[in-house]
Regions:
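Conserved PLP-binding catalytic core of the aspartate aminotransferase-like
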Residues: 328-385
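Short catalytic/ligand-binding loop motif for oxyanion handling, primarily in non-cytosolic enzymes
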Residues: 53-58, 203-204, 270-271
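Conserved core segment of the aminotransferase class I/II
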Residues: 5-7, 94, 253-332
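N-terminal "arm"/small-domain region of PLP-dependent enzymes with the aminotransferase-like
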Residues: 2-90, 94-97, 101, 302, ...
């Protein structure tokens, strides 16, 4: 039905077509960042968002990245043309080789890869692809997991039931491996997807041992579960990119499991705002790889058309040059090393204060985060001390430095004593 200009309905604030919508909750991490920014206190600490900070509490552009940016800027051949739908070819190959360890030609023929909008885009693309191609009834997600995992699967795979497998043991601040395996053994069904953190688990900082990874792979084979790895922190757990890729490579090397991996370069290259990522699928044969990749490219075209080029150029430039790659690996060691130093410093300060509870888990955990064991009540009390972390107790350790670690430890000591509730017992 058509309208004349005079007959067009006028929508005011009171009768908008969108007034039926409920206001969605804001993201808690970015909300906390806003609270921190508004806090007028001179002494304060933000342990919220998962970004690396240097000893001065400032963003750190990796020296290798700075060097390559200058080289790209001075290259007269640099342009801003569209990339292919699957992304910058040399980047996609470099990302694949970094993750899978320079795979053999026979393995390469079974790996399909394309560039994505960082790790979030890779998880989204994978969720949508698996929803459309495999129609799984359930996806198993660790309890807890990165909060955005839930939202991504809600949007990209709304008909897939999200189930939680036990992961964190609050009594010991350690991995509940027995509970995890028992739940998956008894309740997971053939065809279910299982989401696994490749290393530096977010938010707990607790990873399975290699022997435990082998048992998880055995279970996936036995139960016919489909592994979906999220690799957001390669190089941040141990400081060694090969060591941190061990779980993914072990699953692949068994030769019995098809799987997918979402890969992010935000953390290990410090390219948070450039949104550099990749998605990989490992199939049982080359024909299946080609078919799956064609569907992934089809989805990519409909959603973003082409991924952005700048950050991908930086990563590819570094990974394709042995000298630059070696320099970047040193940058990684600096970042992971400082985080480990800050873990030890916080633990040492709490020990010196004789803060009630066992805090050994802070140094036992790895990667960017610590699941401190602090309760929501204690976390909220910390905000009055101008210390900001998530209500789950997750703390971004890179937010600590030599100037604020004593203040943070004293604040934790204060709220723990005031609450009379020690957050952890001896493991």
């Amino acid at each position: 039905m058509g309208y004349t200009r005079e007959e067009l309905p006028v929508h005011t604030k009171s009768n908008s077509l969108f007034n039926h919508l409920e206001t969605m909750p804001g993201d808690p991490i970015f909300g906390l960042m806003s609270l921190y920014a508004k806090d007028p206190a001179e002494e304060k600490a933000s342990l919220t968002i998962g970004v690396y900070r240097d000893e001065e509490g400032k963003p750190w552009v990796l020296p290798t990245v700075k060097k390559v940016e200058k080289m790209i800027a001075e290259d007269v051949a640099t342009n801003h043309e569209y990339l292919p739908m699957e992304g910058l070819h040399v980047f996609v190959e470099s990302a694949r080789d970094l993750l899978f360890g320079n795979p053999s030609p026979s393995l390469t023929s079974r790996i399909g890869s394309l560039q994505t909008i960082s790790g979030t885009g890779a998880v989204h693309l994978g969720a949508r692809f698996l929803n459309d191609s495999l129609s799984p009834k359930r996806i198993w997600v660790s309890d807890p997991t990165w909060g955005n995992h839930h939202a991504i699967f809600d949007i990209a795979a709304p008909n897939v039931e999200q189930k939680m497998y036990p992961y964190y043991d609050a009594a010991t601040c350690s991995l509940n491996f027995t509970g995890m395996m028992k739940t998956l053994e008894n309740e997971a069904q053939p065809g279910d997807v299982i989401l696994l953190h490749a290393c530096a688990h977010n938010p707990t900082g607790i990873d399975p041992t290699k022997e435990q990874w082998k048992q998880i792979a055995d279970l996936c084979e036995r139960k016919h579960l489909f592994p979906f790895f999220d690799s957001a922190y390669q190089g941040f757990a141990s400081g060694d990119v090969d060591e941190d890729a061990w779980a993914v490579r072990h699953f692949v090397e068994r030769g019995t499991l098809e799987l997918v991996v979402a890969q992010s370069f935000s953390k290990n290259f410090g390219l948070y705002g450039q949104r550099v990522g990749a998605f990989h699928i490992v199939t049982s044969d080359e024909q299946a790889r080609d078919k799956a990749l064609s569907h992934l490219i089809y989805l990519q075209r409909a959603e973003i058309s082409n991924p952005p080029v700048y950050g991908a150029r930086i990563v590819a430039f570094i990974l394709q040059n042995e000298e630059l790659k070696a320099e970047w690996e040193q940058d990684l060691l600096i970042m992971s090393g400082r985080i480990k130093t800050m873990r030890a410093a916080l633990f040492g300060e709490l020990q010196a204060l004789e803060t009630p509870g066992n805090w050994q888990h802070i140094v036992n955990q790895n990667g960017m985060f610590s699941y401190t064991g602090l309760s929501e009540k204690q976390v909220l009390a910390l905000r009055k001390e101008h210390i900001y972390l998530l209500t789950s107790g997750r703390a971004s350790i890179s937010g600590l430095n030599r100037d604020n670690v004593k203040m943070v430890a004293k604040a934790i000591d204060k709220v723990v004593r005031a609450s009379g509730d020690a957050p952890a017992v001896a493991a």
